[in-house]
Amino acid sequence: MRILKLLELVVKVSLFTIALSSVLLAFLIFRATDAKVEIIRGDHPEVYDDSAENEVPTAASIQRKAILETLTNLMLESQTPGTRQIREEESTIPIFAESTTQKIISVSDLPNNCLNASSLKCEIKGISTYNVYYQVENNDVIYSCVSDSAEGLEKCDNSLNLPKRFSKVPVIPITKLDNKRHFSVGTKFFISESLTQDNYPITYNSYPTNGTVSLQTVKLSGDCKITKSNFANPYTVSITSPEKIMGYLIKKPGENVEHKVISFSGSASITFTEEMLDGEHNLLCGDKSAKIPKTNKRVRDCIIKYSKSIYKQTACINFSWIRLILIALLIYFPIRWLVNKTTKPLFLWYDLIGLITYPILLLINCLWKYFPFKCSNRGNLCIITHKCTKLCICNKSKASKEHSLECPILSKETDHGYNKHKWTSMEWFHLIVNTKLSFSLLKFVTEILIGLIILSQMPMSMAQTTQCLSGCFYVPGCPFLVTSKFEKCPERDQCYCNVKEDKIIESIFGTNIIIEGPNDCIENQNCAANPSIDNLIKCRLGCEYLDLFRNKPLYNGFSDYTGSSLGLTSIGLYEAKRLRNGIIDSYNRTDKISGMIAGDSLNKNETSIPENILPRQSLIFDSVVDGKYRYMIEQSLLGGGGTIFMLNDKTSETAKKFVIYIKSVGIHYEVSEKYTTAPIQSTHTDFYSTCTGNCDTCRKNQALTGFQDFCITPTSYWGCEEAWCFAINEGATCGFCRNIYDMDKSYRIYSVLKSTIVADVCISGILGGQCSRITEEVPYENALFQADIQADLHNDGITIGELIAHGPDSHIYSGNIANLNDPVKMFGHPQLTRDGVPIFTKKTLEGDDMSWDCAAIGKKSITIKTCGYDTYRFRSGLEQISDIPVSFKDFSSFFLEKAFSLGKLKIVVDLPSDLFKVAPKKPSITSTSLNCNGCLLCGQGLSCILEFFSDLTFSTAISIDACSLSTYQLAVKKGSNKYNITMFCSANPDKKKMTLYPEGNPDISVEVLVNNVIVEEPENIIDQNDEYAHEEQQYNSDSSAWGFWDYIKSPFNFIASYFGSFFDTIRVILLIAFIFLVIYFCSILTTICKGYVKNESYKSRSKIEDDDDSEIKAPMLMKDTMTRRRPPMDFSHLV
């Protein structure tokens, strides 16, 4: 009976359980379950929870859903899904509580989870130089956040490297790879604001929006004025800015200056150190950039201080060596004499330094007998070798010169008295310190210390409006009209501006002031503008600006920023301020703004032809063709090389100078852009889970995005259920993932289409000055010369059709690179557009890209290992092509400079024979024009174009007062002539006359008037007066090693000129032969002199006087002369 009752109880319990489960199952049949997705992306695991999507509806959940919908409505305008709408009034929304009573709350009262990170679960996802990207979790909802402040994030996970504060210096992104190495000052997270399917909600500081996050390289932004240094202090400049905070730094291209930006407010002074004056550093301040010109501070200071005195300048410039020589002389005589005189009074000093150097002294004394050069009596070094006694160093008495009979240091006797003492004993110390060798060394150390003290005391060197009418304004960043500039945007309009068809009415709230004026708005602006501020913006700034104001608000207006250095329009200024706010609206607009450079920092250190270091060569014509002298010239195709040729016709009295200078040589590549690749910094995901159904059921709530989608089914079965879910082999989890790319480390991939050897060649002298680009494909030709390239080396590691990578350091890399739309595991994934949008990726994630896990009790989880293709790690296998950075032109070509010879440059010069003849009459010069453009008292000089018409062919010298010229001789042909000439003037040559002297004859001179001179201030921030710059150039030319080498070879120019291209080789051979010849004759003379001294011939000279003649005979040089047979006669008695 008991068994039957027990069975009955079990059946009833089972039926009750089944009934209860059926009711619950029916209630939850279409409900989704909680699930959690975990993204693992390198060192940045990301966890996202969808519990807000799947929880059982309660009053709290309904309220939270209403809040999220309100935030979404603030961001998205339902009627125009591609834009954002700013509310003019405070919006209110109804929220239903459990009692179904309506409650009204303000949008400003809604909680901002990103600002409450300190009290919520949060995790740092990435730290840049100027902001931080993090995520917070509240009520199982994950919020993505970007903030310019680190406040309240100290307790977040991965906050170990979080700085206490971020710099507030305004910056904007750099999108052009070529500019990154020049202007990069760190990185910053930006939001690319869009409403496409690949975006997601994100909050920047306290402003919610929709878009994608990317890490970008940034540069400084802002209004900054750089004041040139004055003559009194030529290495200090001052910078000023009207903005509240501005940043500056001195940067060498390619240098990492991520945390070296210096902020200032108002003004600041910068003093350049000698390292900054190498010509490679740039001063960056806001939008402004300035190249610090190459200046030898030591030389220039001496040139200025001792102007016009070459000897004082030389002494001053070489003072660093002269001061060492002076110290050496002081040590050798006065200091040594002083030390020798004070040895006894300073015995404590010698004991002290002896104690300090005792191990060294002990070692030297013990090893002295093994030294190759020893003194026989003093214990000092001796150059002349001779036998030395072993007892020489054991002078134990300071005052005595006597030596000890036995030297304990060198003694081999075992029973010596000193052997019973240790090396560290006082007996051994006194013995070692008092030896002559040790005492001489201690005195030498004392002399050196005194010399160093004196050396340290010696000097190192000798030497647009937005105003309604009067008092009502619109200020960017504030949605209300104001009456003046403000620190904080007011809560409502402070004035009113009514724009009518024929007039404008302005009124100030709180006063009775009403002003009327004519309608002078921008014409042809057709757009709707209802509020007062919209009318003002449409009137003064136009409809395009009004569209930006409505749909793309400024969170920080930067009211003091004008963008005057970049010449920004009102639209461009607004977009630049949006970039300062961390928002990217359009890649093309951003690329345009960030590519604007104010200043000369990108200018290369291009100087005039360095004639002082170029070799000189006399050149005689090879043949006469059609009445013209033909000169054949061959040069090595090497950048920086060249020759100064002196042209002759064997009869001409004056040689004509002709200079060829190869400025640069390299290879010009034509390329086709493929894609951009960048590392994945972090990952964002979104998904939806269901308790029953399959992927199709899940996709009804989480639609396919088109790429990087995933779906897992089934996710509900025995042992893998969550609370209130009893489905078996049902359910699905679907979603998508999006990567956050580090565009700071992006590479652009190109395909090589064509390569050509190119040389930039400058020609100066008799033909005037001009620079031309010569290629190997088509020979260059003009009226007087032809040039052609014969290439020896063309294969430099890059082949046609090969893929190359342009890195963030502006270098070119080659290697295994994936082609576009090729999923091969080589460097080149992810494949993106320039603005970081994927163009080739996985459409659906595979099983290897993620893993799924669950538990009997708890939430399901998905671990995504890789969101799309990622092979950026293979960049280590790429090979850098050249150490010289390159710059791309319109993403279609670049020039790769080479530092070695690529072949030969052959030039044929045809000069009319009349150039070498005296003009038969005064030439007629008509239609003259001389126009100049440049600067005075500067290194660049005035670039002038001289044009005229001549009736004769002749050679002429040219000159002009107060100016030096790049060339002083021109070849004038019959007909039209045009020359490029550079003039360096100390005064404005406007309306002055340039004089032409045909064949140097002043009797038939011709004058040409300077028509126009446009003087432009150079960008150089260090003024270099032309007078001192000329002296410096002259000094460098006179003291140049190349100039000296060319000078000592110059006597052989005439002979070597007959050997053509072997000119310089023959000069060196002749110089070496001459040196050997001089050495040979000097050796003979030395032998004669030695014999003369050795035989003492000078003692054998005698003065012979004949009896009958008072003439002095030549002295006899014989050593063994005969003696007189009789004594000399005495004539004293005749007196």
Swiss-Prot record:
Signal for signal peptide peptidase as annotated region, ranges: 437-484
Lumenal side: 36-314, 485-1067
Signal peptide limits: 1-35
UniProt cross-references to Pfam families, sorted A to Z: Bunya_G1
InterPro entries: Bunya_G1, M_poly_TospoV
Membrane topology, Cytoplasmic segments: 367-484, 1089-1135
Disulphide bridges: C114-C145, C122-C156, C224-C285
Glycosylation sites: N116, N210, N588, N605, N980
Record remark: domains: The cell attachment site present in these glycoproteins may help in the adhesion of virus to cells.
Name this polypeptide is given: Envelopment polyprotein
Organism listed in the record: Tomato spotted wilt virus (strain Regular2A)
